[in-house]
Amino acid sequence: MSDGACISAATLYRDAVARRRAFRLPGYPTLAEAGFDGDYVSPIQMSSGNLTGPMLISKDWLDAPSAARHHAQLSRTGYLPDNPFNRVIDKVLAMLGLARADIYITPVFHLLVSKRSSTIPPAHARACFKAVGQYELLGRRPVALGTDSARVLRAFGIDHVPAPHPSARIGSFDLRASRIADAVARA
């Protein structure tokens, strides 16, 4: 990528961060309200925020109770290495010979949900993607991790590669990782 394109990507990313900071929906805490505001769209980008790397889009970052319970760890790394989502992502990275710093992970929904595995009304997920997420694409063809993120991307006509959600209750970690790695290779 040329220096001009890098500057453009960085500028677009800063715009997405500002949009995330401004986005609100009643009933959902913001990252700032939970003590996680930073120069990122999602805290997981502290470790997986490569603006030119493969893009993986999930449903949400975390639920508010888990974010509060693990605040110290999340403030350092932006993710919980021992949860199923991240254990599968680590397997994907090993299969592809990549590190977390080589990829970009983001959710379609940038607010905190009330509990683990919460259902986000489709209208809320679309509103957040319209306000924030579409500005993170930066010309990349994303991998949609799970049906929720794929549904949002389809609603906006975004070309993407579908893959199972890393935390889906289907198959083994290895099976999910293999399918996600294949999707990343096709993106």
Residue ranges and their predicted role:
Residues 2-141, 147-149, 154-156, 160, ...:
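A polyanion-binding, active-site-adjacent surface
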Residues 169-179:
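Short, charged, surface-exposed secondary-structure boundary motifs
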Residues 122, 179-180:
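Short, hinge-like loop/turn segments at secondary-structure boundaries
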Residues 180-187:
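A polyampholytic, Gly/Pro-enriched intrinsically disordered region
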